[in-house]
Structures are given as C-alpha cells and as structure tokens.
Amino acid sequence: MTVINIVSGFLGAGKTTLIKKLLQESFQNEKVVLIENEFGEIGIDSGFLKDAGVDIKEMNSGCICCSLTGDFTIALKEVIDQYHPDRIIIEPSGVGKLSDVKKAVEVVLSEQVKMGEAITIVDVAKCKTYLKNFGEFYKDQVIHSQAVVFSRVDFVSEDKIQEAVDQIRALNDEAVLFTTSWDLLNGNQMVDLIQQKENLLKSLEAEMKHNHEHHEHHGGCCCSGGADHTEKEACNCKGDGHHHHDEQKS
C-alpha cells in the first residue's frame, strides 16, 4: 500500500522544514519518495535525504500544476511502479492550486494507492497579506487541506496568531490547526491527530448517510420538505410514518 501526502504552502512558509520533521519523527521506518519541482523552495540537502532513505524525482518540466494531465501523472505512476514506496510526499510549487494537485493524484489511486492527508503551511505573520494579494491560490490551499500548520508562531503575538486562526477557520472549519511552536511539535503526534480527525469526519459522514437513507426508506413524512426533526412537536405528522432523532447531548 502506498499513501500519498501533499505538503503545500507559499514560498518560505516552511514546507521543506516540515517535511524533514515528518521524515525524522513520523515516517522514519517507511520507504518514502519525495516529489518536488524546481520552482519550489530550496531543495532538501541530498545528503540528508540519502541518510533518510528518501529518493527524489524532480519535475524538470516546471511547475507541478502546469503539466497535471501529462508529465506529472506519468512521473507519479513511474515512481509507484519503480520504487513501490510506503509513502509519497508531494511538495508542489508555492503558487500551485492544491485542488489541481489532488485531482492529478486521483488519477493514480487504486486499491494499492491511497490518498493521504494534505497539509498546508501558513506563515502566521503573512497570512492576512497573502489572503489579500493571492486570494485565489491561497484560499485554495487552505480550503482543500485536512490540516493547517502555522509557522513563525514564535515571532508574533498571541493576538496575531488568533487573527490568523480566525481567517483560516472562516475558509475551512474542519481542518486540524496547529499553532504550537515547531520546537515543541512532535511529528508523530501531528500525524495521529490529523488521522483521528479524518476518521471522525468519515464516521460522522457515514452515520449521516445511514440516517438519511433510513429516513427515506421507513416511510414518507407528511411535513413540507420531508426533513428530519429533532423535536416531535415540531413535526406536523405527529410522529407517524417515520422516526424522529433526538439531539445528541455532548
């Protein structure tokens, strides 16, 4: 089984640093392939990669998002066929749309190739400026992430961090947000929290789908709209013909 993760973020946000952290603390026992492009951040030192057992396949054709249906997809398939890695980490260009990269990855998904979590790095000091100046690209990276890791948190005030959190939450209210100093942030804990959140969301989605199908097949509601109700009194059908789901108290 090969898991594909994407680590995105604008230039200088700290993608390379985070990837090194994950390789050392989270994926050290896995066979990993790193795919990056020449317009990304300064490449990770080849000596470090060799010691970590990581292979690099550079995209010489340019930005990863400029050749999604051709060069990138072919290269990705070659990596999987040649190396049979446990994990592939894709570091796309800082100006690439994360949604486009994910679409390209979906082409190679199979029973043996799984899409992992997408992580976006946000420079907490530049968040407001980038949202204003690079809105479309920046918002796309945030919206399509399962986790957002804030960098440079040691150099700004708590108010500045909270401002950035509020801005990101307005775009993505489901992603796991990390505002901890990277010196205190453990790669294993980070990955575990992201996966726990993803499993919870999938479980909730499955439960909602089950409840919806159960409601549809158990009999029609005579109320306008035919929606579920949390209070029997709010339903004109007086409880006949379908179940009413009580609100779960947390």
Where are these regions (language model features)?
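Compositionally biased, low-hydrophobicity segments enriched in charged and small polar residues
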Residues: 39, 111, 143, 147, ...
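Generic hydrophobic/packing signal
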Residues: 3, 27, 33, 54, ...
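Broad hydrophobic/π-residue packing in well-ordered secondary structure
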Residues: 10, 39, 87, 138, ...
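C-terminal accessory "lid"/substrate-recognition subdomains
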Residues: 156-250
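Short, hinge-like loop/turn segments at secondary-structure boundaries
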Residues: 50-53, 136-138, 194-198
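Phosphate/Mg2+-binding loops and adjacent switch elements
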Residues: 82-187
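Nucleotide-state-sensitive switch-loop elements of NTP-binding domains
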Residues: 2-8, 13-131
